[in-house]
Swiss-Prot record:
Record keyword Lyase present: yes
Keyword vocabulary terms for this entry: Amino-acid biosynthesis, Branched-chain amino acid biosynthesis, Leucine biosynthesis, Lyase
Record protein name field: 3-isopropylmalate dehydratase small subunit
E.C. numbers: 4.2.1.33
The family this protein is said to belong to: Belongs to the LeuD family. LeuD type 2 subfamily.
Catalysed conversion reaction: (2R,3S)-3-isopropylmalate = (2S)-2-isopropylmalate
Entry keyword annotation includes Lyase: yes
Entry-linked SUPFAM superfamilies: LeuD/IlvD-like
Pfam families on file: Aconitase_C (PF00694)
Subunit relationships: Heterodimer of LeuC and LeuD.
Top-rank taxon, per record: Archaea
Function in brief: Catalyzes the isomerization between 2-isopropylmalate and 3-isopropylmalate, via the formation of 2-isopropylmaleate.
UniProt pathway: Amino-acid biosynthesis; L-leucine biosynthesis; L-leucine from 3-methyl-2-oxobutanoate: step 2/4
Length: 162
């Protein structure tokens, strides 16, 4: 996957991803209109399909709501790369079908850098800077869940194959 980096700092909580006042919505498309509204008001209008959210440590901390990864999915972000994730956000993102990769080198990535990410190997190529970083690749079974679009779609596939 290839996309432009949207850079965020440490401790980006789920209220920053999608403010609580928008929890009345539950579809990815509707939530996408308000993604990062309080911290990056330009995000929803300027994010392009396959763009990549890049952050520091503890991305997705705070409330354990599925609305945050749903908003990212609705924004058509191809993946989220962070130094670390709040565990409940990490799991919710997988369940929703949003790829998440942990990479210690996110400080080297700047807002607007063009990235190419190989989810299967965890290799991140920064095309803007000519650098390569190594993220922790997702285990095969987790990648299968993400590839199917989330846990529900993955379960449907397993049932249909029986």
């Amino acid at each position: 996957m290839k996309g432009r980096a949207w850079k965020f700092g440490d401790d980006v909580d789920t209220d920053a991803v999608i403010p609580g006042r928008y929890l009345i919505f539950n579809t990815p498309g509707e939530l996408a209109k308000y993604t990062f509204e309080g911290v990056r008001p330009d995000f929803a209008k300027n994010v392009h399909e396959n763009d990549i959210v890049v952050a520091g440590s503890n991305f997705g901390c705070g409330s354990s709501r599925e609305h945050a990864p749903l908003a990212l999915k609705g924004s058509k972000v191809s993946c989220v790369i962070a130094k670390s994730f709040a565990r409940i956000f990490f799991r919710n993102a997988i369940n929703i079908g949003v790829p998440v990769l942990e990479c210690p080198d996110t400080d080297k990535i700047d807002d607007g850098d063009e990235l190419e990410v190989d989810i299967s190997t965890g290799v991140i190529q920064n095309r803007t800077k000519g650098e390569t970083y190594q993220a922790t690749p997702l285990p095969d079974f987790v990648r299968e869940i993400v590839d199917e679009g989330g846990l529900i779609e993955y379960a449907r596939k397993l049932v249909s194959e029986r």
